[in-house]
Amino acid sequence: MLKVAILDDYQNVSHEFVDLKKLSGKYEFKIFSEPFKDEADAIEQLADFEALLIMRERTPITKNLIDNLNDLKYIITSGSRNKAIDLAAAKKRRVIICGTEIDFAGTTELTWGLILGLARNFKEEIDNMYQGYWQSTIGFELKGKILGLIGLGRVGSQVAKIGKAFGMEVMAWSE
């Protein structure tokens, strides 16, 4: 049975989206919902695992960590890349690394939620509403404003399209 450590699941996403019981015949899972104290703690707690399933870039998967996990065979990351993984060290140890496809719609939506929240003072308005006040501030329209973006990759280009739909002038810098 392959021993799999699920790291950095601070929001218990693995329970919500995956039925781990269906996989229990072939895999033994342990979910780490809290960060490790330090690298020595990570080495101690992960020593017996053959696979690390890592979420985002929270725990650095360093050369030292990889070199000290003798049973490690696989590193699986959410997303197509993870800058927290020392790829050269993994390659040297012949640890297989794989990722998942990612849909950037959620990131784009969150970006626009935050922009709209700032433009329309959502936090202040919600706080005031709970205190019995209604429409205490005036936000501003996005139409005609300049949206500055650094990077026009997959997320930036989607954010730019929505900015144009709001009638904004989009200015961007990208390599």
Regions found by a protein language model. Give the residues of each.
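Phosphate-coordination loops involved in phosphoryl transfer and adenosine-cofactor binding
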Residues: M1, L72, K143-I146
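N-terminal glycine-/charge-rich "phosphate-binding" loop or analogous flexible N-terminal tail
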Residues: M1-A51, M55-R56
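Cofactor-binding loop segments of dinucleotide-utilizing enzymes, especially the Rossmann-like FAD-
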Residues: L7-D9, E34, S80, L152, ...
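Short glycine-/acidic-enriched loop or helix-start segments at secondary-structure transitions
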Residues: H15-F17, D41, T62-L65, A84-L87, ...
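Anion (oxyanion) recognition and catalysis
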Residues: L23, K91, K164
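Hydrophobic beta-strand scaffold residues
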Residues: F29, I96-I97, V170
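Phosphate/diphosphate ligand-binding glycine-rich loop within oxidoreductases
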Residues: F49-I126, Y130, G139-F140
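Rossmann-like dinucleotide/phosphate-binding beta-alpha-beta segment
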Residues: T137-E175
